[in-house]
């Protein structure tokens, strides 16, 4: 799944900090600290980051597109 532009619950724009979140997560930082630094404060917005799958820097969408 491609990361959403807005939070599904509150509609806040969250995609603007996704690349930094992804980079810092890849570097081994704690996800809670990253979201705090990026000032993602609402639980609904934080859930969008926590539930988005990243395995070996690949998103679920990257796996699905191989079978189109």
Curated annotation (Swiss-Prot):
Highest taxon in the source lineage: Archaea
Q: Provide a GO biological process annotation.
A: DNA-templated transcription
Q: Cofactor note from UniProt?
A: Binds 1 zinc ion.
Q: Name one Pfam family in it.
A: RNA_pol_N
The record's subcellular location field reads: Cytoplasm
Q: List required co-factors.
A: Zn(2+)
InterPro entries, alphabetized: RNA_pol_su_RPB10, RNA_pol_suN_Zn-BS, RPABC5/Rpb10
What catalytic activity is recorded? Answer: RNA(n) + a ribonucleoside 5'-triphosphate = RNA(n+1) + diphosphate
A molecular function (GO) term:
zinc ion binding
UniProt keyword annotation of Oxidoreductase present:
no
What PROSITE patterns is this protein classified in? RNA_POL_N_8KD (PS01112)
Q: Name one GO cellular component term.
A: cytoplasm
What's its top-level EC category?
Answer: transferase
Give the residues the record marks as binding Zn(2+). Answer: 7, 10, 44-45
What keywords does the record list, in alphabetical order? Cytoplasm, DNA-directed RNA polymerase, Metal-binding, Nucleotidyltransferase, Transcription, Transferase, Zinc
Establish whether keyword Nucleus is in the entry.
Answer: no
**EC id:** 2.7.7.6
**Per its UniProt record, what NCBIfam families does this chain match?**
PRK04016.1
Q: Which family does the record assign? A: Belongs to the archaeal Rpo10/eukaryotic RPB10 RNA polymerase subunit family.
* PANTHER family, per database record: DNA-DIRECTED RNA POLYMERASES I, II, AND III SUBUNIT RPABC5 (PTHR23431:SF3), DNA-DIRECTED RNA POLYMERASES I, II, AND III SUBUNIT RPABC5 FAMILY MEMBER (PTHR23431)
The record's annotation in HAMAP family points to: RNApol_arch_Rpo10 (MF_00250)
Q: What does this protein do?
A: DNA-dependent RNA polymerase (RNAP) catalyzes the transcription of DNA into RNA using the four ribonucleoside triphosphates as substrates.
Q: Subunit structure, briefly? A: Part of the RNA polymerase complex.
This one is known as: DNA-directed RNA polymerase subunit Rpo10
Provide the species name: Methanococcus maripaludis (strain C7 / ATCC BAA-1331)
Q: Which gene encodes it?
A: rpo10
């Amino acid at each position: 799944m491609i990361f959403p532009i807005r939070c599904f619950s509150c509609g806040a724009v969250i995609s603007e900090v996704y690349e930094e979140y992804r980079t810092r997560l890849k570097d081994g930082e704690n996800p809670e600290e990253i979201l705090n630094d990026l000032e993602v404060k609402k639980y609904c917005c934080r859930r969008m980051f926590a539930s988005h799958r990243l395995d070996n820097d690949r998103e679920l969408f990257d796996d699905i597109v191989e079978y189109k």
